Structure formats: C-alpha cells, structure tokens
C-alpha cells in the first residue's frame, strides 16, 4: 500500500467531474486500499478519489466507533453512487482534507438513500442519516467537482477566502 498526495483547494483538479468506474480489477482494488491508508493517515472520515487525483466515481467513508477508533471492516467503499431518495434538512459543521484547517456549518439532507457498487461491482442500497448522510453527500459532491465551501453563504465564503489569504501569506502558520 502507498500513501497518496491529497490535493488542496484551490487546485482546479478538485473541480473535475469524475467518470464512472468500469473496471473492478486488481489495480482498482489497490487504488481503494491506497485511498483508505491515505484517509486514515490524514485523520479523515471520508475521501473521494478526485482528492488524490483519480477522476473516478469512487469514495470511502470510515466513521469511528464509540471508542473513537476507525476499523477497516467498517469502511464503506462506495463506487458509482446515485441518490435514490433524500429527506429533511440538517445543519452540520464540516471540514475537508482538501481544505485543511477550515470548518463551517453547511446545510445538507438529514437522510439519504443511495444505490452504489462495492469493490466487486455488486449493486447495493444504503440508507443513511445524520453524520453518515452528511459524509455521503460531502463526498458525492467531490465526484461532481463541488466543495463544501461552495455551499457557504456569501458572508461565510468571504470569511473563508480571507482566512485562506492569511494562511497563504504566512505559510509557517500551516499545520
């Protein structure tokens, strides 16, 4: 396995609309494994392939258990996802591995139902609510070239741009 480089905002790569996965071969499985290793090493709970430069409709979500530990067997590998149903509304504070150090409240659907394929191309259906629903929406947005900062109000977006400018002026402040 290998750690992959996470692409950061404002890279244009993050605006790429990802293509359907058609080959579920050994190379594809290795990409999923490398993505998982990268996500865990970066202390993330989700990662879309485009965030590591792969323009493919695949994402991972690995929520920690009550003890705060992320177990690989809990990792959702979601390939070629499609929304079937969405319900309700929830405000949730989000962050992103591609936008490090910035967290802001974003409005999302409270519940989602998706159809997707697993690593073996088997079609599955998943119903999710709260944090899992938010994470799914966040990562699917990445597959469509959308970042959570795009969903901010004008005021919050200006705050984000100002913080980003300050961070870029003083790179030693980066964590």
UniProtKB/Swiss-Prot annotation:
One Pfam family in the UniProt entry: Pep_deformylase
EC number, as in UniProt: 3.5.1.88
Active site: 139
InterPro entries documented for this protein: Peptide_deformylase, Peptide_deformylase_sf
Taxonomy, superkingdom: Bacteria
One example of a Gene Ontology biological process annotation: translation
This protein's UniProt keywords: Hydrolase, Iron, Metal-binding, Protein biosynthesis
Matches recorded under PANTHER family: PEPTIDE DEFORMYLASE (PTHR10458:SF22)
Functional note: Removes the formyl group from the N-terminal Met of newly synthesized proteins. Requires at least a dipeptide for an efficient rate of reaction. N-terminal L-methionine is a prerequisite for activity but the enzyme has broad specificity at other positions.
Name recorded for this polypeptide: Peptide deformylase
Lineage: Bacteria, Pseudomonadati, Campylobacterota, Epsilonproteobacteria, Campylobacterales
């Amino acid at each position: 396995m290998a750690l992959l480089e996470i692409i950061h905002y404002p890279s244009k790569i993050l605006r790429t609309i990802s293509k359907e996965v058609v080959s579920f071969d050994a190379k594809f499985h290795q990409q999923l494994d490398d993505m998982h290793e990268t996500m865990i090493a970066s202390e993330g709970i989700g990662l879309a392939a485009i965030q590591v430069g792969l323009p493919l409709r695949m994402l991972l979500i690995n929520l920690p258990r009550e003890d705060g530990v992320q177990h690989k067997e809990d990792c959702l590998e979601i390939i070629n996802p499609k929304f079937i149903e969405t319900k309700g509304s929830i405000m949730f504070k989000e962050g992103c591995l591609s936008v490090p150090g910035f967290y802001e409240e974003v409005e999302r659907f409270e519940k989602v139902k998706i159809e997707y394929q697993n690593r073996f191309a088997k079609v599955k259906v998943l119903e999710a609510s709260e944090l899992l629903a938010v994470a799914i929406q966040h990562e699917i947005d990445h597959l469509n070239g959308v970042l959570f900062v795009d969903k901010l109000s004008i005021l919050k977006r200006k705050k984000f741009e100002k913080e980003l400018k300050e961070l870029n002026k003083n790179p030693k402040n980066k964590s």
